Amino acid sequence: MSDFPPRLLSEEQHLLSGCLAQDRQAQFRLYQQYKAAMFSSALRILGDRALAQDALQEAFVDIFQGLAGFRQQSTLGAWIKIIVVRRALLTLRREQRMEVYDQDRHPEPLVAWHDNLTGEALDKAIGELPAGYRAVFCLVEVEGYAHGEVAEMLGIAEGTSKSQLYHAKRLLQRKLHYLYQ
């Protein structure tokens, strides 16, 4: 039994049917319906608006190409979020490889950062977490997913999700300790 009202399910089914039939208006409505929430998820993982927008566009290409494979074991929104998160993680890994290559050629000088704004400091500290830690932290602490759901989304064990969250929190505490002194 579903927790969603029948009207909502039939609207989602109608939208899905239109997208499967390559109806451009249905595809546009699907994109419009989910773009803001999915952009926020990608942005939290990537920490860069341009990269998040690129990842979102690539994810929606993946979504439209893979819609026939949607088995309706979850809501359409949950399935879309999994694809967006995975695409954002792929983008993050690609960018990190490019960044390492770039730093080898042009090392940047060390820059001291002195943020007085807690929100900015937290955003920066989250952005500096290793990719896996950041993804798990954002999905559990910001998005509110359970470890089982995160494990499924990221293709990791539930214990790994819990461990990565623990280590992410420890790193954040160390990075932000100066705010509480």
Show which residues each predicted segment covers.
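A short, charge-rich alpha-helical start-of-domain segment used by transcription regulators
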Residues: 16-40
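Sigma70-family region 2
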Residues: 20-21, 44-47, 57-75, 94-96
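Amphipathic, Lys/Arg- and hydrophobic-enriched alpha-helical face
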Residues: 31-49, 66, 126, 177-178
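Structural recognition of an alpha-helix C-terminal capping motif at a helix-to-coil junction
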Residues: 40, 54-61, 74-86
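Helix-turn-helix DNA-binding motif, specifically the short coil turn and the N-cap/start of the second
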Residues: 48, 146, 155-160
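Short, Lys/Arg-enriched C-terminal cap helix and immediately downstream tail that follows
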Residues: 71, 93, 129, 134, ...
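Short, basic/polar amphipathic helix motif occurring as a linker/hinge flanking DNA-binding modules
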Residues: 81, 91-113, 117
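A short pre-motif secondary-structure segment
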Residues: 136-140
